[in-house]
Amino acid sequence: MKGKTCFYDVEALDGDIRICLKGEMDHHNAVGVRGEIDKLIYDERPKRLMLDLSEIGFMDSSGLGFIMGRYALMEKLGGTLILENPNERIVKIFELAGLQRIVRVENSKKEKTK
């Protein structure tokens, strides 16, 4: 599936959903992807939504807003959001924003953090 320069693949996993985001997560892309993913969440009601960020090369404050919006939606529906495999630049953005204190972040190549 495709936003402007942000693409994503969806994988259903026994009541969970993993979405692999690819490209850039900025204002223009977050708007398009947001509606599609929210519809998927409402339709499927996953226990866990895992956003794989390993292929995101750029993220700005709109990307953080996108993540926090999905966090709030999953909390509202009784589910959990997990961010997977962010690169070092994205981790730095999360640290500066304090996001890792709120949303679970896991890296399959390193230790899991929360």
Language-model region placement:
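Histidine-anchored nucleotide/phosphate-binding helix
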Residues: 67-71
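STAS-like cytosolic regulatory interaction modules
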Residues: 1-55, 72-114
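Short, solvent-exposed loop/turn at the beta-strand->alpha-helix junction
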Residues: 57-59
